[in-house]
From Swiss-Prot:
Keyword annotations of the record: Differentiation, DNA-binding, Metal-binding, Nucleus, Repeat, Repressor, Transcription, Transcription regulation, Zinc, Zinc-finger
Gene (name only): ZNF431
ZnF region ranges: C2H2-type: 176-198, 204-226, 232-254, 260-282, 288-310, 316-338, 344-366, 372-394, 400-422, 428-450, 456-478, 484-506, 512-534
UniProt domain KRAB: residue ranges: 35-106
Localization: Nucleus
Cited function: Sequence-specific DNA binding transcriptional repressor. Represses target gene transcription by recruiting HDAC1 and HDAC2 histone deacetylases. Acts as a specific transcriptional repressor for PTCH1 during embryonic development. Required for osteoblast differentiation and sonic hedgehog/SHH signaling response. Binds to the consensus site 5'-GCGCCC-3' in the promoter of PTCH1.
A Gene Ontology molecular function term of the record: DNA-binding transcription factor activity, RNA polymerase II-specific
Organism field: Homo sapiens (Human)
Full protein name: Zinc finger protein 431
InterPro entries according to UniProt: GLI_C2H2-zinc-finger, KRAB, KRAB_dom_sf, Znf_C2H2_sf, Znf_C2H2_type
Similarity field: Belongs to the krueppel C2H2-type zinc-finger protein family.
Amino acid sequence: MDDLKYGVYPLKEASGCPGAERNLLVYSYFEKETLTFRDVAIEFSLEEWECLNPAQQNLYMNVMLENYKNLVFLGVAVSKQDPVTCLEQEKEPWNMKRHEMVDEPPAMCSYFTKDLWPEQDIKDSFQQVILRRYGKCEHENLQLRKGSASVDEYKVHKEGYNELNQCLTTTQSKIFPCDKYVKVFHKFLNANRHKTRHTGKKPFKCKKCGKSFCMLLHLSQHKRIHIRENSYQCEECGKAFKWFSTLTRHKRIHTGEKPFKCEECGKAFKQSSTLTTHKIIHTGEKPYRCEECGKAFNRSSHLTTHKIIHTGEKPYKCEECGKAFNQSSTLSTHKFIHAGEKPYKCEECDKAFNRFSYLTKHKIIHTGEKSYKCEECGKGFNWSSTLTKHKRIHTGEKPYKCEVCGKAFNESSNLTTHKMIHTGEKPYKCEECGKAFNRSPQLTAHKIIHTGEKPYKCEECGKAFSQSSILTTHKRIHTGEKPYKCEECGKAFNRSSNLTKHKIIHTGEKSYKCEECGKAFNQSSTLTKHRKIHTRQKPYNCEECDNTFNQSSNLIKQNNSYWRETLQMSRMWESL
């Protein structure tokens, strides 16, 4: 028993503060060895110390003061070194040297036993507190107790150590952690971390790239990016990544592996996050709602993109042509136009695209998959966005309104096209003949006039068309489908444009006005025909008689009259 001395040592556990180690005082018997103040001191870096607010710093000093009392109680003294603030030297906040262990246990200072808590508004470092209080100790205040082999042999003479004695027991076989201060410290620490998130303060800055963080832990994690920059390389294509997990996901591009499968429909994905997003299709959940207009989305990124509609902000500008965009991804895609780059290639037919979304849409041509079904009419679609647009046919919803004339549309693209009527803008020009259009699909359709290509063929009658939309409309002739119904009179149409024209009968609206004579029309095509009266333009020429007409319909009538006359003549000759 004489070979044993009662000691204090730190028990290290994870705490709320990044990088810090929570030290619990543990009292146990161990073989006689040199004990230092560092053994029970918690050491912080400058960044970690700045993480604490004044209340936490005070609490920390109180805990360390208690540790110091315990060491004095057990026979460890601390030297009186100059009170230099360690924080100013960017060293650990608490760094104290001790005297060598004395032959006999040192005295217990009565000054330390008077109170357990230092001043609440103390600004000094803990080292200065210790030195100031230790300096007040005089020899007459020291009460020595020699030859103590254990704690219970040492009789406490000051009331200030009553609480300390309660934490200690004379049982040599057990270890009792005293976490009286640690619990309070942990509570303060979590409260401070929570407050930092609300204030948006980011005190921890990366010296390499300048990025700031609100927590030291996040900065530590971020620093690993610089340490292991591009350290994980793909053996297949040589592309390098900062994270092993990113490399693992990348490899699936080469292997085609899709380990994350939807239990509802069996569709598989390369990433778990994509599967999570996909599942919302089945549940219909849209947890992300716009505070401005109330519109809801199933992805936070979609909400972020949507918000820019209200602000009108376009921070991403093309250096080549000056065009601005509200998304960085849209700018990246736009740049492919200038470069002529088409990095996304279809493995089935080798067709290339400048957008990944275009490739994805294209692939459905080969698979014929239509997983999105309309509950109203049972029609299937290969895209959820297409289904959303289709549903507006049944509901009559037109959320996109023109600010100039008040006309509403069920698709944003239709509103964009409509606005060009007011501006007169036609940005899409044919290189072959110079004709300009306000929509790129119109230019694409026009180009086929020059090539004569008709890739879309009707399986029913074999008729070919230059556009897939025209083929879709044509098929309704065979099926008799008329999905566009007038709510006013119940009349149905196989084209939405026909329904739009029909509705004007009920409203009497004539929004297309002739600038020359002021006459108004309910259709833009009628206005175009009318204008030829003023210009005396007659672009339609009859090959039979060289007569010219200002309307194609008049030319058709002329041709029909020739055809009827020819037919009558042939019949007359047959009767002779």
